[in-house]
Regions:
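N-terminal transmembrane hairpin
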Residues: 1-126, 207-294
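Structured inter-helical modules in multipass membrane proteins
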Residues: 108-217
Length: 294
């Protein structure tokens, strides 16, 4: 049984959570909401992946810095010019906007990392396999492609090194080895897609309604979570409609305050994102109490 309590919830609950977390995470550019999203995504990612997840979380920090620093080179708009480079102004507003865009990218990568661990292919097919079988199969293949691609790439590089290939230290040797690996991985991905499609077609996939590999039943706890999430999403959407998440960067920085009535929207957003983490610690505390009574 999965140790993460949220992973044991009904797939509809899990899909609604990630739909809200990723959907609002993409469109909201307010720094406070972005920071809350990063904390929640990183925390849940570490709970799912254990100590090994720190490597992935830290790996995104150089990406964040690089995207932040590069944005003003392509977007010189803004009032506060920090310095000029190549005859173009390097503005503070563009730097701040680059940080927000980079933050959104990193947060989305973390949420998708959590999604791939929680929403397995059988859960997704259970939800949408009978409604849109072709689209469901395509989305499952896409979501599985990235982690499988990196895993297969590491295996291929390790296999090549074990036979003495790809160990050159020169620039030309490294480029040649990289192109060889890329060519092999491209062929592997295309071949895998064709084989999967042919295999599913030969099994009659999509020709009629199908049963799920695993039976997922809606419990009272699932219904309670659905009601809570819908209520929190309604509060967040209402705050966004009233302008409580407004953020302007050009020509000058301007953010909606997290105070007054807008504070309730921010609290609802944080509560929504922390649902899986709260469930995890709630179960851990419950088991700790039970074990202490033995």
């Amino acid at each position: 049984m999965d140790r993460d309590p949220f992973s044991r919830c009904h797939p509809a609950v899990q899909f609604l959570f990630f739909l809200g977390a990723i959907g609002f995470g993409v469109v909201i550019q307010h720094p406070a909401y972005l920071l809350a999203g990063w904390v929640a995504a990183a925390g849940y990612y570490l709970l799912l992946h254990g100590p090994g997840g720190w490597r992935q979380v830290i790996m995104w920090l150089p990406v964040f810095v690089a995207l932040t620093v590069l944005n003003p080179l392509f977007n010189p708009r803004g009032e506060h010019v920090l310095f000029t480079i190549f005859g173009r102004p390097y503005t503070g507003e563009a730097l701040a906007y680059g940080g927000v865009i980079a933050g959104v990218f990193v947060v989305m990568m973390l949420w998708f990392g959590c999604y791939n661990r929680v929403m397995t292919s059988d859960k997704f097919m259970c939800l949408f396999g009978n409604w849109a079988p072709s689209l469901s199969l395509l989305l499952v293949m896409v979501f599985r492609l990235v982690p499988r691609f990196f895993r297969q790439t590491r295996q291929l590089i390790g296999a090549r090194r074990s036979v003495g290939k790809g160990t050159g230290k020169g620039y030309r040797d490294k480029v040649a080895a990289g192109m060889t690996v890329l060519s092999a991985m491209t062929s592997w991905a295309l071949e895998g897609s064709v084989i999967t499609a042919a295999s599913m077609r030969s099994r009659g996939y999509g020709s009629a309604r199908r049963s799920c590999f695993q039976v997922f039943r809606v419990t009272a706890g699932d219904r309670l979570l659905l009601v809570m999430m819908l209520a929190l999403l309604a509060a967040v959407l209402g705050t966004a409609t009233l302008g409580g998440m407004a953020a302007d960067f050009i020509p000058q920085l301007s953010f909606a305050p997290i105070s007054g009535g807008y504070a309730w929207g921010f609290l609802a957003y944080c509560s929504y994102l922390l649902i899986p983490t709260v469930l995890h610690f709630r179960e851990a505390l419950h088991w700790h109490i039970l074990r202490s009574r033995i």
